[in-house]
Amino acid sequence: MSAASTAEGTWRTWIDTPVRWAGAAAGVAVGALVDFSPEPDVQLLYAFPAFGLCVMAGVLAADLVARPRHSWIRVAEVTPRRVRDHVPRALAAFLAAQAAILTVLVVIAARTASADSKGRPGRALAVECPAGSQLLGPWPGLYYAWPALGGTALGTVACALLLRRVTLRSQTHDQRRIQARAAVGAWGVLVTAPLFAVSFTMAVVVLSLSCAGAAKVFALTALTLTAFTSALSGCHCLGVLLLPQAYTEARS
């Protein structure tokens, strides 16, 4: 008996998906029950990254709880395993592009951010219009956007470690692909959730501008499309990790 066939018989699939659901439910509860800021408009910028971290924690917990219990009989495999052979490349590339967009938006927001009406730096957008100056917020400068960048960086490290564990583990190729897809899905939530929060918050501020003309229309269109795409991507990633069997059957 090979190590892969032994692991297949001891993988506790009955607990894997429920633990992932528990992580997502914890993320929803944290966002709904925890007041990250006394300013209601800022809640979105903190709650969405927190949700993504809870989802990733659920996937990590599921991997620890449901991982195979190896038998004392082990057979070495000659074929080398590589992480890229198990990762859904199209999804990973699409999510990497969104992570780059998130970084660009945060950099733009940080460079254009100003102090708010209370003199606190990096929390508002100051604009000079013919009718007068405007001070709009919240604007996702570094003060508000650090949870998005920090959560994405932390989740990227966790995803890389989990993918390595999955690749080196003794189990069938299909099981590795399912586990790797779930890890990428969790990372996708960590990317798309803050991307939606940042792009949506910026779009609301841009919509409130009383000037800017064509530049306003272009920026608003780009931010709206980004928020919409990130929302769809986030829902897809949740489906990948919360409904793995349905996704596998649809792909087969």
Model-assigned labels for residue ranges:
Residues 1-117:
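N-terminal membrane-targeting/anchoring modules of bacterial envelope and secretion proteins
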Residues 154-166, 175-252:
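C-terminal transmembrane-bundle signature of multipass membrane proteins
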Residues 30-50, 106-148, 200-225:
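Membrane interfacial helix motifs at helix-loop boundaries and amphipathic/re-entrant anchors
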Residues 28-32, 51-61, 101-104, 148-161, ...:
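Hydrophobic core of alpha-helical transmembrane segments in multi-pass integral membrane proteins
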Residues 64-181, 187-194:
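Generic multipass alpha-helical transmembrane bundles of integral membrane proteins
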Residues 2-5, 37, 71, 114-117, ...:
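Generic serine detector
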